[in-house]
Amino acid sequence: MATIVQCLSSCATLESQFKVLSLKGISCSSPSSSFSNRRGASATLSSSLSFSQSVSQCVAFSTGNLWVQKPMRQLIVCEAAAPTKKADSAAKRARQAEKRRVYNKSKKSEARTRMKKVLEALEGLKKKTDAQADEIVTVEKLIGEAYSAIDKAVKVKALHKNTGARRKSRLARRKKAVEIHHGWYVPDAAAAAPSEAVPMAA
């Protein structure tokens, strides 16, 4: 906006200079003065024309419209690359699900087999009349293998952790019951006897 106002004021100054030049040319009568006036007028005219030329380079007037040249702008276009990762297909998901199902089934089956061996050994030891205390060591080894199988099944999430804890507790209770049956383990009297009621103070 400031550039347009400056150009308009320069055009008005140029018009006034043209009027002064025409008046000076009419009033002068002597050859020497007319020559000097013509020389000065030509200098003024040339300076005015040079100014008007510089103005016309900046702003062009055409049929009452003001045209201002805008600077050129460079545009940078970036193309987004397509994703390289291929989407999983339904067939692939089915294969993975089947693979996990077979793996989890094997872990659960192993834990179940180990537990069955422990329970059978404890049942046979309980029915045996002349059982010795050293025979429980073999059962304890089987219990350790069963615990390991249960922990592996829980680790791969084939079994819930609470389910694994219940199964291990079941084996421990069965072992303790056999030891109590043969007299190899005597529970504490305080734990076996019911707790006596504490009399209230009068």
UniProtKB/Swiss-Prot annotation:
UniProtKB keywords: Chloroplast, Plastid, Ribonucleoprotein, Ribosomal protein, RNA-binding, rRNA-binding, Transit peptide
Gene3D superfamilies registered for this protein in UniProt: Ribosomal protein S20
Principal subcellular localisation of the protein: plastid
GO terms, molecular function: mRNA binding; rRNA binding; structural constituent of ribosome
Keyword hit for Plastid: yes
Domain of life: Eukaryota
Stretch forming the transit peptide: 1-79
Family as reported in the entry's similarity comment: Belongs to the bacterial ribosomal protein bS20 family.
Record's protein name: Small ribosomal subunit protein bS20c
Source organism phylogeny: Eukaryota, Viridiplantae, Streptophyta, Embryophyta, Tracheophyta
